[in-house]
């Protein structure tokens, strides 16, 4: 009898764990391949060039989030409150609204490439680099929207297959453009753009194939847009603060020091990006949809669901802390034999960066209940506090401790962000 109860109790986690493992293995494979390519590019790019590439790539990640004005985030929050037919209509409306907003903005940016270059890249990028980065920013919405649908539906295998396919395209294009044709930074940007264009094209094919009833209509589009903007608006500053918390320190480092330090720090943060792809991304594709579905089903009281969620969080953070510490020691031993000498010092900052990501992982658990209850303004406030703290500490600590000051500031800010989310989740029950 006890065995039957135990099996019934834990069987609900089987599909979630399976989806997590599929996404995690796929992400590990993806990041493993791209990491090898990145290490090889270190022998081609100087730290200053690597720093410039890092700045451009961060812009390519950040600008699309502003470009969609919170539409994709609004879609995520609405998805679990609608049935299948309403979800399809929601996708159609969001695509139409996005096109009406994004096309004029992209056109304006293309006409002011030089100004954008001086603001974002301190005038060190070229016009073609900015042009391709803007095209990437426009296309990314469609690829991410499709991947979001797959994550919400917990279709981990298809999601992982697409990721691996995109990674292989990136690798092939990097080999052709960077290592063979030797066109430098712009080759990496083109390779990244080709990979998301592949996902966007497959998403469009699936969109047409799945009887989505695609159409262009203005029927009630204004009222729908208003509702979605109100729902998604807090995500716009929220995205800005999230970016400041995770990546804004690179701009402060570039402003206070030089591109060489940015390149060293960017290489250290690749360990954090690996953690993001192998742990955080699979969580967003498996555990978070699982939790949101569990809240929506209302089969158990919220306090009981949160009690188990909190238990999962603490155990996961402890285990990851141990694994990160062991992995860092291993990296310190083998890193000097793999990396070019000019990049070896980047290994000194890896442990601090990864510990910050572990606390950030904790917020994934805490914020589930806040996301389900659509408490976007609460999340915005917590993000604003943590991001502001990060910037202030960066300006205070970088002049004193250099890159160490940058990593310590980010770690402290992640700890603060975790604490605020944990407190907010307790109040939400």
Predicted regions and their residues:
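Helix-loop junctions and terminal segments of transmembrane helices
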Residues: 67-83, 152, 268, 272-306, ...
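C-terminal transmembrane helix end/exit motif
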Residues: 2-5, 75, 148-149, 156, ...
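Hydrophobic alpha-helical transmembrane segments
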Residues: 127-131, 160-210, 384-389, 403-426
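Interhelical loop/hinge segments that connect adjacent transmembrane helices in multipass membrane
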Residues: 2-16, 125, 157, 185-189, ...
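Interfacial segments at transmembrane-helix termini and the short loops linking adjacent helices
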Residues: 16, 113-133, 310, 328-358
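Signature of the first transmembrane helix
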Residues: 15-72, 109-110, 136, 167-171, ...
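Membrane-water interface segments that mark the loop-to-transmembrane alpha-helix transition
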Residues: 18-30, 56, 65-114, 128-131, ...
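Membrane-interface junctions at transmembrane-helix termini in multi-pass inner-membrane proteins
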Residues: 78, 138-162, 351-385, 425
């Amino acid at each position: 009898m006890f065995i039957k109860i135990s099996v019934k109790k834990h069987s609900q986690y089987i599909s979630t764990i399976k989806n997590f493992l599929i996404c995690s293995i796929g992400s590990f494979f993806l990041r493993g391949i791209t990491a090898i390519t990145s290490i090889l590019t270190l022998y081609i790019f100087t730290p200053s060039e690597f720093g410039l590439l890092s700045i451009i790539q961060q812009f390519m990640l950040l600008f699309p989030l502003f470009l969609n004005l919170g539409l994709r985030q609004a879609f995520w929050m609405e998805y679990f409150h609608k049935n299948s037919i309403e979800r399809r209509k929601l996708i159609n409306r969001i695509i139409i609204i996005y096109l009406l907003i994004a096309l004029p903005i992209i056109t304006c940016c293309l006409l002011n490439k030089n100004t954008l270059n001086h603001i974002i890249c301190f005038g060190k990028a070229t016009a073609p680099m900015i042009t391709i980065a803007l095209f990437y920013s426009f296309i990314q919405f469609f690829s991410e929207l499709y991947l979001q649908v797959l994550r919400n539906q917990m279709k981990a295998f298809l999601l992982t297959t697409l990721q691996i396919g995109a990674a292989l395209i990136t690798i092939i294009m990097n080999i052709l453009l960077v290592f063979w044709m030797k066109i430098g930074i712009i080759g990496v940007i083109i390779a990244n753009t080709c990979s998301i264009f592949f996902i966007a094209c497959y998403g469009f094919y699936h969109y047409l194939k799945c009887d989505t009833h695609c159409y262009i209509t203005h029927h009630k589009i204004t009222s729908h847009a208003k509702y979605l903007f109100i729902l998604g608006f807090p995500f716009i500053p929220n995205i800005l603060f999230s970016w400041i918390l995770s990546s804004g320190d690179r701009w402060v480092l570039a402003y206070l020091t030089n591109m060489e330090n940015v390149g060293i720090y960017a290489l250290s943060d690749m360990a954090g990006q690996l953690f993001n792809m192998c742990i955080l991304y699979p969580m967003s594709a498996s555990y978070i949809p699982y939790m949101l579905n569990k809240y929506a089903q209302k089969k158990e009281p919220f306090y009981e669901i949160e009690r188990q969620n909190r238990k999962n969080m603490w155990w996961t953070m402890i285990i990851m802390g141990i694994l990160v510490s062991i992995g860092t020691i291993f990296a310190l031993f083998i890193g000097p034999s793999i990396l070019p000498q000019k990049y070896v010092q980047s290994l000194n900052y890896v442990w601090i960066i990864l510990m910050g990501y572990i606390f950030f992982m904790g917020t994934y658990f805490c914020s589930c209940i806040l996301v389900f209850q659509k408490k976007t303004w609460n999340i915005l406030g917590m993000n604003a506090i943590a991001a502001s703290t990060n910037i202030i500490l960066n300006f205070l600590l970088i002049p004193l401790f250099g890159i160490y000051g940058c990593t310590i500031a980010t770690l402290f800010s992640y700890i603060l962000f975790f604490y605020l989310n944990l407190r907010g989740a307790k109040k939400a029950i």
